[in-house]
C-alpha cells in the first residue's frame, strides 16, 4: 500500500504464537507509510492487539522480519529505545498506562527516560500539554480525572516522545459522544502534522470517517489490506471477519440505487458530505 521510500515500519512474513495457545499471527506482511491513516479491523482474538505489540517491539516474532526505516530491529536496548521513541502505543484503558502522581509528571516520564536535557524535557512536556489542552490539569492527580481526560493524558504521554507513528487501541471505547468528537479533532490535528496514525477499532462508523486505508484481520491472518471504501464493499471479507458496513455507507448506497446516482462519485463519510451527496442525488 505504500511506496518503498515512504515506508516507516515494515513487518515482513511475521508469525507469532503465544505459549499453549492457538492465538497469534500467521505469516503477515504490512508496511506503514509516512502520514497514513489506517484502521485495523476484526473481531476479538483476530490478532489486532498482537499486531500492535509487534509493531512497538513489545513482542518478538519467532519468524519473519521487522524493520524500522529500512533497518532491522534487534533485541539490543538501543534499537528498542529508538523504536519505542518513534512508535508509540495509546492503550485502550488509560488506567493501565498512567503511573505518575501528577499529569505533568506523567507526561514528562517518557522524555526523562530518553535521558534528554531538562530544557528539552520541559519543552516537550509543555508542547504535549498544550496540544491536548491539559495546562489546567498539570498539577492534578490523574486518578481523579474523567475517562476522557485520562485518555487525553495518555495521548500526551506519547506526544511528548515526538513519535512518527502512533498506534491507538480502541480509542473511542468508553468515551461519551463529546469526548469521541474531541478525540477525532485530535486525530485530525496529528494527521495534519504528518504523523502516521494506526487505529484498532470495532467502531466501523468511526473507522470509515477516519481512515483512508483498512487492514482486516481474522484468525491471525490478514484478509484484506486496501482502501477503506473497498474494505466495506467486499461482502465476503465482511462476513468472514464478522464486520458490518458503516451506517452512512449503507444509506449512501441505498440512495444511489434509488436515485440512479453517478456510481463514479465517492460515497460520503460525514454528515456534511452526506448533505452534498443528497443535494446531487435529488437533482437527478
For the regions a language model picked out, list residue spans one by one.
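Helix-to-loop junction immediately C-terminal to a conserved catalytic motif
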Residues: 56
Amino acid at each position: 500500500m505504500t511506496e518503498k521510500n515512504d515506508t516507516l515500519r515494515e513487518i515482513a512474513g511475521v508469525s507469532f504464537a503465544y505459549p499453549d495457545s492457538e492465538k497469534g499471527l500467521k505469516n503477515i506482511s504490512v508496511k506503514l507509510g509516512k502520514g497514513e491513516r489506517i484502521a485495523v479491523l476484526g473481531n476479538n482474538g483476530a490478532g489486532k492487539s498482537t499486531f500492535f505489540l509487534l509493531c512497538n517491539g513489545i513482542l518478538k516474532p519467532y519468524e519473519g522480519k521487522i524493520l524500522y526505516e529500512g533497518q532491522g530491529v534487534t533485541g539490543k536496548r538501543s534499537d528498542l529505545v529508538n523504536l519505542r521513541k518513534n512508535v508509540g502505543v495509546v492503550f485502550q484503558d488509560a488506567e493501565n498506562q498512567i503511573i505518575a502522581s501528577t499529569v505533568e509528571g506523567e507526561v514528562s516520564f517518557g522524555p526523562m527516560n530518553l535521558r534528554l536535557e531538562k530544557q528539552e524535557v520541559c519543552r516537550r512536556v509543555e508542547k504535549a500539554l498544550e496540544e491536548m489542552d491539559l495546562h489546567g490539569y498539570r498539577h492534578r492527580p490523574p486518578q481523579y480525572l474523567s475517562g476522557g481526560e485520562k485518555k487525553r493524558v495518555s495521548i500526551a504521554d506519547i506526544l511528548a516522545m515526538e513519535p512518527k507513528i502512533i498506534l491507538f487501541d480502541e480509542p473511542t471505547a468508553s468515551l461519551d459522544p463529546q469526548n469521541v468528537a474531541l478525540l477525532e479533532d485530535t486525530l485530525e490535528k496529528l494527521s495534519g502534522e504528518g504523523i502516521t496514525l494506526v487505529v484498532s477499532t470495532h467502531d466501523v462508523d468511526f473507522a470509515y470517517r477516519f481512515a483512508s486505508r483498512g487492514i482486516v484481520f481474522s484468525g491471525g491472518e490478514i484478509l484484506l489490506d486496501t482502501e477503506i471504501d473497498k474494505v466495506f464493499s467486499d461482502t465476503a471479507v465482511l462476513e468472514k471477519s464478522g464486520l458490518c458496513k458503516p451506517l452512512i455507507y449503507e444509506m449512501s448506497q441505498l440512495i444511489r440505487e434509488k436515485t440512479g446516482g453517478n456510481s463514479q462519485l465517492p460515497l460520503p463519510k460525514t454528515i456534511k458530505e452526506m448533505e452534498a451527496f443528497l443535494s446531487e442525488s435529488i437533482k437527478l
